[in-house]
Amino acid sequence: MSVNVYDVAYDLEKALRHSEEYSTLKNLYDEVNADESSKRMFENFRDIQVNLQQKQMTGQEITQEEVEQAQKTVALVQQHDKISQLMEAEQRVSVLIGELNKVIMKPLEELYGNPEEN
């Protein structure tokens, strides 16, 4: 019996969309975006985060000034209740996706072995 992995992947996508973790994330995201000041603060945080990640991935140096700005921004958003909750919800969804990825990669790990165990 042949399984269409794409159909299963779309079923997994639907399951993720209906999960408690995603539902919580979406609700918090909508709440943050409903308030203009919260939305601007969160967008600023995300812009800084993405910029630093891109620099890191391309091997560009991150300046001390950028590190300090990022630290100040993180401290600021952590004080904002809804944004802090949103970041926690993002982390929970990220953990869930990581766990799903482990399940998906299991056949290849069994075939080739797990490089983390060597």
Swiss-Prot record:
<dbReference type="InterPro" id="IPR023378">
    <property type="entry name" value="YheA/YmcA-like_dom_sf"/>
</dbReference>
<protein>
    <recommendedName>
        <fullName>UPF0342 protein BPUM_0928</fullName>
    </recommendedName>
</protein>
<dbReference type="InterPro" id="IPR010368">
    <property type="entry name" value="Com_YlbF"/>
</dbReference>
<comment type="similarity">
    <text>Belongs to the UPF0342 family.</text>
</comment>
<dbReference type="Pfam" id="PF06133">
    <property type="entry name" value="Com_YlbF"/>
</dbReference>
